[in-house]
Amino acid sequence: MGARARGEISRKQLLAAEQAALRDTIALFDCTGSPVITDGEQTKPSFATYPLSGLGNLAADGLTIPFADGNTRQLRRLASGPFHYGVHAVTYLKTAQTYARHPLKQAVISSSALSLLYPRLRRNGR
């Protein structure tokens, strides 16, 4: 995804790489014998912000979420409304199902986490 963002590969090349990673991940999970597997979120740009892909009403100066391991995730800020999903989790599930032989679970970001996109509103001069 970084190579695509830097213009080093085409969208078609990125999609091919994503699909290869997805097929490999699902095949490896299948080998574990687990009755339910996951797609490993291989094709999501971010576990927290995948629903925002393609939206044009976001600004870059949103909340930063720190993690215990020292990593951070910078959320975008909703610059204008209304909010809507750019991509739904079912899109990732349907793609993964084309490769899976076992039931899949799909990670979905909570609506409460997405509420962090909304700018803080000033009340009573604060």
Language model features with spans:
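Domain-level signal for soluble alpha/beta catalytic cores
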Residues: 1-126
